[in-house]
């Protein structure tokens, strides 16, 4: 019964997040060799050999080869952006995905040093229990003590 309930929950969430799940499935062949790191909160977390940073789309999150299971980047993606997607459903790409990828492409050109100051990233960090800190002029994530 527990397994059936889990499967029904996963299918419901997959359909609720269908647009971003489709984008994730279409992206997979371009992310290099994928290694499954974990499955938590109805989300598959993969390490991709051609990834730098991370991206979350529906039931799938992808991180760089340097990420580990306890890495803040993993938490940012799997516990932050995934929760956003689960809450927003079909609105996720409009509210988080498109603005977030645009921000990632432009923030340095716009003169910002802190990638995590944008609303999409701040909210993901809050959901994941993370905060930013500065070291040698660069911004990093850490778990809130």
Regions found by a protein language model. Give the residues of each.
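Metalloprotease/metallohydrolase-associated module, dominated by Zn2+-dependent proteases
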Residues: 2-36, 40, 49-50, 92-145
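Short pre-active-site segment immediately N-terminal to the catalytic Zn-binding motif
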Residues: 50-54, 61-76, 86
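Catalytic Zn2+-binding segment of zinc metalloproteases
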Residues: 79-96
């Amino acid at each position: 019964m527990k397994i059936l309930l889990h499967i029904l929950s996963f299918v419901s969430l997959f359909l609720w997040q269908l647009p971003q799940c489709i984008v994730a499935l279409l992206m997979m062949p371009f992310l290099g060799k994928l290694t499954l790191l974990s499955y938590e909160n109805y989300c598959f977390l993969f390490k991709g050999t051609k990834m730098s940073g991370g991206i979350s789309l529906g039931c799938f999150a992808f991180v760089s080869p340097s990420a580990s299971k306890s890495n803040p980047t993993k938490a940012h993606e799997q516990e932050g952006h995934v929760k956003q997607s689960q809450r927003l459903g079909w609105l996720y790409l409009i509210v988080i995905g498109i603005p977030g990828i645009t921000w990632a492409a432009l923030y340095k050109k716009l003169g910002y040093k802190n990638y995590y100051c944008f609303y999409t990233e701040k909210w993901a960090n809050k959901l994941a229990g993370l905060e930013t800190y500065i070291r040698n002029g660069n911004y990093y994530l850490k778990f809130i003590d």
